[in-house]
Each structure stands twice: as C-alpha cells, then as structure tokens.
C-alpha cells in the first residue's frame, strides 16, 4: 500500500540516509567506507565504498559467501591502503567485530524494510590482522609450509577438503597470547581434516585447535598412521606440536587428522 511505501521510505531516510549524510559531513574526503547495505550510504556520503557483501565491489562475493573467517583472512591479504578506513554496517551482518573500532554514530529504527534495527558507524581497527600467522607456542624454527584454514587461497593451494563445511561454522577465533589479543579465521565443528602440506624428515608439525572436550586424535601422513595426538579441552585455541619421523620424505604429503 501507499502507507507501507511511505513508512519504508521514512525508515530508510532515518537510518541509512541519515548515516550517509553524517558521513558526508564528518568523514575525510579520502575515507573508504565499508558497507553491507550500500545504496543510500554510497549515494548520500559521496565517499568511496567497499561493499563487504560484494554487490558493488566485485572482488568480495566469494569471501562473503564463504563466511566471516574467510573474510578476515582475505582482509589480511589485502594491502592496507585498500581496506576500509571506516565501517557503516549492521554489526550482526558484519560478524567480524575484531576489526570494528570506536563507534562514532548509530541510527536505530525498527522497520522490516531495513537490514537490521541498528546500523553503526565506526572507525576501522586492524591491529589483530596477521597477529596469528606464525606458531605462538614454544615451537620455533624455519617455517616450511603453512595451511591457513578459512583462507580460501591457502585452502586451495593445499587441497584442503571442505567436507560438510558451512558458512555459519566459518568464524573468527580470538585468544590472548604473548601479552596481546590475537585473532585467526578458522572452521568450527570439524571432526576430520584432510590436506596436503610440505614436510621434511624430523620436522615438527604444529596444529592450532579448539577442543571442547579432552580427546585423542588419529594422525596419518601419506596413509601411514602415526602416534595418536592427545589434546585437552580449551575454550581458546591451543597448539599441538608433533615431531615427525625421520623417514618422512622431503616433499608434499597428504595429512589426515581425525577425531573419534
């Protein structure tokens, strides 16, 4: 009806249009605004936008479809100058609070036409990007190879088997390690991991895991079953290190890690 149309237009005016005008009047001319509902904000702000959903930024749809952890990993690969300087988003859509900094403004409007009740404008914060790229436990030495789970490019390079992976299970995980906040993309709900990674004889294989109950994991390297891996329950991640046998070849190997 005409009344519904008028109410919807007014809701957009009070939320998205209002924040777009706020951005025009407040943010620097060279600001890049990360958005997840792009129309009115892009039009009224007059600022360059970065559409995290990908409707108007063509590089982004596959990362949005994959899940929050893959978007976080993708942002780690991007040049700093290409990342948004600010976000005007529905926070529950964004699902990566680790990169949302100080809130500058918000508009709360209750209307079904909108993507959410509250849309917020915030400074972007990238302190946690690349904060967990290396092993963070006691294991040190030359890095031979690395599979970065949820990083779509790394998964493809290592033949990572997705199995039953879902978007909802693709998350950003946090931990406080070595006196700073760390974050890493990952996939939850896994009971079987299968991938290929470069090895060397007597090298140490390090796996970063989150385990809800203590268990023993089975490990295979190129079809050879090695000693079981015991892990404890920890709501944050833990790193398990396993010394590989001397007979392991200096080549890519197929790894399988399985929970009971």
Residue ranges and their predicted role:
Residues 1-11, 48-51, 55:
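Transmembrane alpha-helical segments
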Residues 15-31, 35-36, 40-43, 52, ...:
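C-terminal luminal/periplasmic domains and tails of membrane-associated envelope-modifying transferases
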